[in-house]
Swiss-Prot record:
The Arg-Gly-Asp (RGD) sequence serves as an integrin-binding motif and is required for integrin-mediated cell attachment. The modification Sulfotyrosine is found at residues 316-317. This is Integrin-binding sialoprotein. It is found in: Secreted. One of its GO terms (molecular function) is small molecule binding. Binds tightly to hydroxyapatite. Appears to form an integral part of the mineralized matrix. Probably important to cell-matrix interaction. Promotes adhesion and migration of various cells via the alpha-V/beta-3 integrin receptor (ITGAV:ITGB3). Residues 60-117, 136-225, 238-264 are annotated as: Disordered. Monomer. Interacts with integrins; the interaction promotes cell adhesion. Residues 177-188, 249-261 have a biased composition (Polar residues). A motif (Integrin-binding motif) lies at residues 289-291. It comes from Rattus norvegicus (Rat).
Length: 320
């Protein structure tokens, strides 16, 4: 009995101490001061209880409850809503039938705004894929009725684009023949093997123009070479020349002379003379600055023999 009483006393003291400490901890956390300055969320419940989470705040949704149900007229309001929906559908069907022509014109306008890139052959599938983003969602019946119209408009646009591409390619070929006729396309024009070889009259005119241009360029090349300039190969009808140095009044730098200095009879040192003309200074008597320490001795000779602590406070800044 004595041992049992002793054990009970010890257990009661331990439990009282632990509970006192537990209540003190909760009181400290719930105090007004700690709630403002020392916010520590209570994690011991979430640590030991796996699925214990604080309750979520439920905000009331504005306009979510039906006013008709509150008044007790829910059935009548639903019937009225169904009647309004049916009447609206009938009106929309009539408007859609009346406005088919206007929508088709608007679609053609929007489709013509998008054109294929230059140099890429357009096909029906590619055109449909590119213009899929511009097509508005329609009903199944409208889509079936407008399918032939869409196909016709697509075919017309493809034909126009092909004609424009052909015209642009023809213009580009003509420009290339005029520009590069002196160097590359002279044989093609004579033989009639160019991209537009069907028109013989135009080829003859282009050949005469290119011959005249070739004569002018050869004469200019001869004149330039007679003056001593170097001419490059004609690139796209343009000449690349380098002007003579006398035009800018510049002279080439003198070549360095190699000298051989004999050091006794053992070996010879062969190299270029070191020209120090560009490194000379008037105050250094023609010697390059930095080879010796003499230039720096004059600047730092004041500090020889004593350190920075000998200036006695701020006297150094007032007696410079």
């Amino acid at each position: 009995m004595k041992t049992a009483l002793i054990l009970l006393c010890i257990l009661g003291m331990a439990s009282a101490f632990s509970m006192k400490n537990f209540h003190r901890r909760i009181k400290a956390e719930d105090s007004e001061e700690n709630g403002v300055f020392k916010y520590r969320p209570r994690y011991f419940l979430y640590k030991h209880a796996t699925y214990f989470y604080p309750p979520l705040k439920r905000f009331p949704v504005q306009g979510g409850s039906d006013s008709s149900e509150e008044n007790g007229d829910g059935d009548s309001s639903e019937e009225e809503g169904e009647e309004e929906e049916t009447s609206n559908e009938e009106e929309n069907n009539e408007d859609s039938e009346g406005n088919e022509d206007q929508e088709a014109e608007a679609e053609n306008a929007t489709l013509s705004g998008v054109t294929a890139s230059y140099g890429v052959e357009t096909t029906a599938d590619a055109g449909k894929l590119e213009l899929a983003a511009l097509q508005l969602p329609k009903k199944a019946g409208d889509a079936e009725g407008k399918a032939p119209k869409m196909k016709e408009s697509d075919e017309e646009e493809e034909e126009e684009e092909e004609e424009e591409n052909e015209n642009e390619e023809a213009e580009v070929d003509e420009n290339e023949q005029v520009v590069n006729g002196t160097s590359t396309n002279s044989t093609e024009v004579d033989g009639g093997n160019g991209p537009s070889g069907g028109d013989n009259g135009e080829e003859a005119e282009e050949a005469s123009v290119t011959e005249a241009g070739a004569e002018g360029t050869t004469a200019g090349v001869r004149e330039l070479t007679s003056y001593g300039t170097t001419t490059a190969v004609l690139l796209n009808g343009f000449q690349q020349t380098t002007p003579p140095p006398e035009a800018y009044g510049t002279t080439s730098p003198p070549a360095r002379k190699s000298s051989t200095v004999e050091y006794g009879e053992e070996y010879e040192q062969i190299g270029n003379e070191y020209n120090t003309a560009y490194e000379t200074y008037d105050e250094n008597n023609g010697e390059p600055r930095g080879d010796t320490y003499r230039a720096y001795e004059d600047e730092y000779s004041y500090y020889k023999g004593h350190g920075y602590e000998g200036y006695e406070g701020q006297d150094y800044y007032y007696h410079q």
